[in-house]
Design a protein with these regions (language model features):
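Short glycine-/small-residue-rich Rossmann-like dinucleotide-binding loops
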Residues: 61-65
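Structural/interface elements that position substrates and couple domains in central-metabolism enzymes
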Residues: 1-57, 70-87, 91-120
Length: 120
């Protein structure tokens, strides 16, 4: 079981970040939602920032567009996950370089597809 930070988590069931939280749980992973304005999503405690997470994070799955990523990149690097998944619409070549320099694997893929095709 992996601890997975879901950055850009939404309480709205039609949002992909919400679907990822549910599917991660279904596949026996521990989703850790990150959202500044919510207390709980899909029964999971929500953290306002990456710095608030008490446990080790194995994977970060990103649901924030490029324009909103800069403020959190140093926090992701400090968190030192094994990998960061850039879901469709979050691609950011400049950030890829920073993460790779910090020995963090960059995956450009859909978390939902990775889980459903057993490639997670």
């Amino acid at each position: 079981m992996e601890n997975v930070a879901v950055i850009g988590a939404s309480p709205k069931p039609d949002r992909y970040s919400n679907k990822a939280i549910r599917l991660l749980s279904e596949y026996n992973h521990n989703p850790v939602p990150i959202a500044p304005k919510h207390e709980q999503i899909e029964g999971e405690k929500v953290y306002r920032s990456l710095k608030d997470i008490p446990e080790k994070i194995d994977t970060v799955t990103l649901y924030l567009g490029q324009a909103r990523q800069d403020p959190i990149i140093s926090d992701i690097i400090e968190l030192a996950p094994k990998r960061v998944i850039f879901n469709p619409g979050t691609e950011n070549k400049a950030v890829y370089k920073q993460l790779k320099e910090a020995d963090i694997e960059v995956v450009e893929a859909c978390t939902l597809v990775l889980l459903k095709t057993n490639r997670y």
